Amino acid sequence: MIYVSSDSFFVFWRPGSNQNILTFYRAMKLWSTWITLLILTFFCSECNAKRGGRGGGGSSAMGKHYSRSKSYFTRKYSKPGSIEHTSSFRSFVFGATSGLLMFNAGRHIIQDSSEPISFGNRKYFWGESKYVPDEELPVQCINKIDPQDPQFGKVFFDNESRPQEIVYACPADNNCCGYDCCSNSTIFTSIFSLLVILLIVSVLSIFVIECVRWCLHCTYFCKHGHGRDFEPLSI
């Protein structure tokens, strides 16, 4: 007959293991407290970001009321983006099948500067003067053209002048990344997301280790009728 002590939490734990259980659950309580605080901080930062976005939405409504007022649109300079997307964009613009440029005497001549470059469900314009505002995309992205660029540095209008920038549009809550739009996430949010994931994985790992320990104790107890003299996989 198996005797179950009233002060034991598990039947297969040897005497004195209650202290280990108490320590384990104290650790779990501490971990859960930290996880709760981190998750609350993460959601607070997300709410603040969304609140800021809604504030921008109010100015957007005002911009629509005044029919594309300049204050409605936001100019942003593009920062480095996806290498793959940038490479695909360049290949499309300078590809023979696009019909956008005509190569002549070492120069790429723009065929029709009034026509935007249509690539990936987005329109790109040869400079701010060619840009056509869109109320649904209030962020105006400006990608400056480096004169030393081996490709865009050799692009010219038909009047021998060179475009200074490529302009495209993004939604209100986006940033300009290369020739694409990217989400407006912050380093702070990314770090906390990573910490939350690491903490969750750590807690799950501890639970798995404890389950293995309990299974080993149970197996040993059922086979020998008493607990182990030592605890395997002790944390």
Swiss-Prot record:
Localization terms from the record: Membrane
Pfam family, one: CX
Residue ranges constituting the CX domain according to the UniProt record: 124-185
Alphabetized UniProt keyword annotations: Membrane, Transmembrane, Transmembrane helix
Annotated GO CC locations: membrane
InterPro entries the UniProt entry points to: CX
Listed transmembrane segments: 27-47, 187-207
Major location category of this protein: membrane
Membrane topology summary: Multi-pass membrane protein
Protein name: Uncharacterized protein C07A9.12
UniProt source species: Caenorhabditis elegans
